[in-house]
Amino acid sequence: MSHARLSVGSECWVSNNNGHWDAARLIEIKDNGGGKVVATVAKSSGVLETVNYQQLQNRNIGQSESPSDLTNLPYLNEPSVLHALHNRYNNKQIYTYSGIVLVSINPYQNLPEFYNDNLIKHFHKDPEAAKVPHLYSIASSCYHALTTDSKNQTIIVSGESGAGKTVAAKYIMRYLTSVQGVDHNGVVKRSVENQVLATNPIMEAFGNAKTIRNDNSSRFGKYVTISFDENLLITGANVNTYLLERSRVVSLLKGERNYHIFYQLITGCTEEQRDKWFLESASSFNYLSQGNCDEISGVDDSNDFTITCRALSTIGISESRQEDVFCLLAALLHLGNIEVCATRNEAQIQPGDGYLQKAALLLGVDSSTLAKWIVKRQLKTRSETIITSSTLEHAISIRDSVAKYLYSALFLWIVHMINASLDHNKVKRAAYKYIGVVDIYGFEHFEKNSMEQFCINYANEKLQQEFNKHVFKLEQEEYVKEGLDWRLIEYSDNQGCISLIEDKLGILSLLDEECRLPSGNHQSFLQKLNNQLPTKHSQFYKKSRFNDGSFMVKHYALDVSYQVHDFLAKNSDAIPDEFISLLQNSKNEFITYLLDFYMQLVSSQNKNPRKTAISRKPTLSSMFKSSLSQLMTTVSSTNVHYIRCIKPNEEKLPWTFSPPMVLSQLRACGVFETIRISSLGFPARFSYEEFAHRFRILLSSKEWEEDNKKLTLNIVNSVIPHDNLNFQVGRSKIFFRSNVIGNFEEAHRATCSKSTVLLQSAIRGFFTRKEYQRTVKFIIKLQSVIMGWLTRQRFEREKIERAAILIQAHWRSYIQRKRYLSLIKCAIVIQSIVRKNIAYSRYINELRESSATLLAKFWRAYNARKTFRGLKKSVIALQCVSRSVLTRRYLRRLQDSAGRTSILYEKQKNLQASITEVSKQLKSNSKKVTVLRNKLNILNNSLSKWKCLIKKPSDFSEPVSMDFTSNDEQLVQLLQAESKLRQASQQLYMAAKKSELGFVQSQTARENLSNYYQALQMTVSEKFEYDTEQLPSRVLFYAMDRYFSIHKKLKQLLELVGVENASLLPNEVVNKQTKDLLYEKRVVFLKQIKQALTVSSLFNAVGYKDGVMRLLETDQNSLLFAGVVNFLIFAGISLDLKTQISEFLSQLCSYFTKIVDGTVIENDKTLDFYEKPLQAVLYWFATLHKIRSFLVHLLSINSHGKQSVVEDLWNPLILKFSKHFSNLENSFHSLVQKLLSCCTEGSINALLNSKCLPEFIDAADENTTPTGMNIYELIDRMNLIHKLLISSALQPNLLELTISHMLQHIGQRAFQTLIHGRSPYTWKSASQVSYNASLLINWCHQKGISYVNSSLLPLMQSPLVFCLRKNDANDLDVILSVCNLLSPFEVVCLLNRYQPCAGENPLPKSFSKAVEALSCKYKQSGFTNGKITNTNGHAIPIAASKNPLLSLENNHIYEELRLSELINLLAKATL
């Protein structure tokens, strides 16, 4: 890169003493003659320096000094490239193009904003985004080339250790997998990124180590291919590895560590594994302690070991196989600790070496044989086999070779398992095209370079050769496309260096030949190199001038000197056949499998189409050459993209740029070589529009053309006229050779400088005129200010003189006045002191007297308050006692009134009976009077007829008068009887009125008394009903006792039916006849039990249909059905019918689930509507509880039994279904509570709104008609519910739990409504609530039910808040102390609901203020009422019954199941 012409004033770069470059400006050029030209330059620091003119390099200035593509630099030279990268790095631009190569400088900082999903979409969808240097631009170009050209693609990522190669490869794979979602609507076949990156912990553990330069350095290269199908969907991936650094297993430099897996194993294994593998600390092992670095800051090896184990499981390596891997690693560590000592010229191992025994045990070989082949070697001749002793150095080499051999085989096997987990074979069949990512080491050169650096640089030579071809191919294709006058040129190639390495008589061939010789050594190998290579490859091979055992190879990037000391050992890296035979016969199955795998893999990689007579072992160089050849074949068949990763500083500091280090890497990785190759052509190119826009200022505006191409040619001709060799015109672009564009930049700078000078002169004249005018104005203004200031000064002097005279006069008078006042003040002070003392003594006396008086007053007030509080408490207690006495007296009066009312009631009955009798007589007499009246009418009619017929009445006067007289007497008698009847009826009516009035009075008294008396009547009647209702259940529980007594015998008898070792039972369990009979019918009974173990047949036997059983009327059915089910379960377990029992219990759970789901609860229905569903649900609830109790009983039997096999067989099954039945039991309990809640709907109204005490009814409520259910109806409904619960044969604990939960629900809802409702309460209405709650508590006493936790006691105590006195704050304290079951917050809520009765005074203000203060106190403290909770929806733990239930009496169920014969037989046997 020669510099262009430099003139005085040009910017340039000058080399300093450190071999770096400083920015400078050319001041003077001087020709000293003899072709020696010197120049004087001024550095940026201002120092002048004289240097050789030829050493100066052109410097780019302005916008062109840090372009996005280094080939666009006007001057292409090392300092310009380095400065451009430095500027971009400081501006947080870590990516820069260098032709087709992307240079990436590691920022040593996480930059998520550089790689987010939006950026992926931007690079994928916008073609112009590829012009921006970025990892995604390379990946985008690669992906689009695959989609358009259908050609395989490869991205080569290279660089030093710690330069960011792995991270770059990771983000490239992330891009390639993420764009699948963009192209295919988010449907990605597999996340290859996650699968490949999931293997990173494994590859890092087994292939990474801490070096001097990097804490996590990859000591191998890899090539990851991502395969696509015809639809460009990702189908899989594959990982190929190259050149694992095997020597690191046995040797380390200071400050380095071995592979991470060894340290992870030591710190992360369990104590059991540590003892099993004889592991100690890392410092105790020879292979780990050489570097004196056991830990890395910020790295937790124990946690990494857990991650590694999890990753091994992910790729399909089982835990047992992982144990084998770790055992092998431990064996390698013990192998390195085997101490080989020298006796004269022979190596020897002590037989009692502990590490020898441990290594042999872990490897599965004989310790003596292992020690033998370490210190001995076997030589085969044609006639015999000779065993000779090895030297100390050779024995140690053999020991280390075995360790390296086994570790290399283990590493290749792990890579094979990773590829198997990625399903590579199937990928090859389904793949259409692929994109490969090569993460390979960059060019390496250290103070001492060995076999590893030689192979790495050999690989980089091959890649550089491919890169040279690729660059020239692309460049020349663009020249042809643009139609340039271009002849294809020859370009420099590094084939000579490659031939030096890989020819027949090259370095690798001579190395393999020396390794095959029995007496080969590194001195003879170096001699062969020096004898044969300098003549043929003198340009690339150079002998060492010193006899230091090294040779030099001139690589494309740098001349590297290699030490040949370890070349032969590292190249052969094989173990003797005796060791291979020893390990193949190992007792460790994994060792033999690993050796077979490794040998097959090596033989497959080294297949030679030409068959040779002698079978040769493959060497490291031959295997690496073969794999590198395959890689280059693969890469050459694809379209290649290059990324060079640069390490900016050695300390790994973020955003810190070290120019010397970056410069050495740029030279080593071939970036400058890339620029040199590009400069042979036309590296600088511009579109016509871009060139015209930038350089149009070189022409006057009159010469500007609308056609950009013409304008571009005019500009070019104005700068470099008649110079067609340095540029060419294409179809859409103009091309320039290297450094030509600098002339345009120089002309551009000169034009801008000339224009700037002209512009500056005009601007400076303008500003000078402005400054002059501003100065004149300022001078005029300053003069006026000064004149005014002088005038004011003269006036001030005159004013000061006058003021001085006045001040003197005042001062003299002030002095005299002050002297007089001081005398007066002294007199006053003396007087004040005297008076003060007198007043102070008087004050002290008065203070003592007032204090004594005040203390006496306070003491008397305290005694008075104390006495008053005592009296007040006594009065309150007395009031409570007197009120209770009065209440009891009132109760007795009501009882007496009720007695008198009963007497009146009996009298009323007698009067009603007499009234009824008299009414009957009255009706009969009325009928008689009617008959007589009819007869009278008939007689009157006949008389009138006779009067008309008799002409002479005197003839008939005597007989007629006699008849009339007789008839008239009868009529009079009838009328008299009728009047008597009417009088008697009137008397009876009046008596009935009086009796009715007395009955009304008695009824009123009865109603007053019924509030207290009815509870006693209910208690007596319900006690009788309870005693009678308990009779069937008592009979049932007596039957259960009988079942429990025969339980043990039944178990033994069933074991005789199904258990083969029945002879082991005691003889006294059952007699021989029963035993023989049961054993003979074993097969029949076994078949019957299997048929009975189906839920469908069982439910058909009991008449189950749609959740209802045909014998549901009695509670014996619950015991009967549960006993049959338990018997079948017990029989199935005894007969070892595990499958049938599992299906039977599963179907039983399904039936119970259907019953729960099929029960529909409807609101707003009567109690009769819920009676049958509640009875059915209670039946199934009791049945389910008995079945679950039996399963729990079986678990307790098995847990204390002696047959562990039976326990292990049945306990998991029983425990599983016991949990299922427990969940179903909770579901049934919740269903029962919902039904009970519907049955007790209206209970809140009954507790809070029932007005059962007429004396305590408010005036506002006298005319209101009560609505809803009252307290007596609620108690009747509770009685009916209690009957249903008793009839369901529930266990006592279930019965108490169910009723307690129902009372809890009623009490909580009523208490919440009382506190948070809207209706106000007086002391009378509160007394009604207290009475209603007492009736409900009394009902609990009658039934023997606990109500302590049912919220009834707080409800009972709440009315006291309304009834106690409320005059002042002390009364509030009394209320809080009396209502101890209520929190202060609840008391405040109740007091807010209080309303005085009609005619009562409102609450005093003092009491209201005390309530408000209490309320504010709890609001400020954030108090919330924690007492009122709702237990609905919580699963209540239900304890199983202690006694199981089995049904052994024959019934219709057993008859339906055809088990009657077995039941009868068992019943007889248990008698």
From Swiss-Prot:
Domain (Myosin motor): residue spans on this chain: 65-749
Major subcellular location class: cytoplasm
GO MF annotations, alphabetized: actin filament binding; ATP binding; ATP hydrolysis activity; calmodulin binding; microfilament motor activity
Domain Dilute as annotated: residue spans: 1171-1417
InterPro entries (UniProt xref): Dilute_dom, IQ_motif_EF-hand-BS, Kinesin_motor_dom_sf, Myosin_head_motor_dom-like, Myosin_N, MYSc_Myo5, P-loop_NTPase
All copies of domain Myosin N-terminal SH3-like, residue ranges: 7-61
Disulfide bonds, paired cysteine numbers: none
Record carries keyword NADP: no
Protein name as annotated: Myosin-51
Species the sequence originates in: Schizosaccharomyces pombe (strain 972 / ATCC 24843)
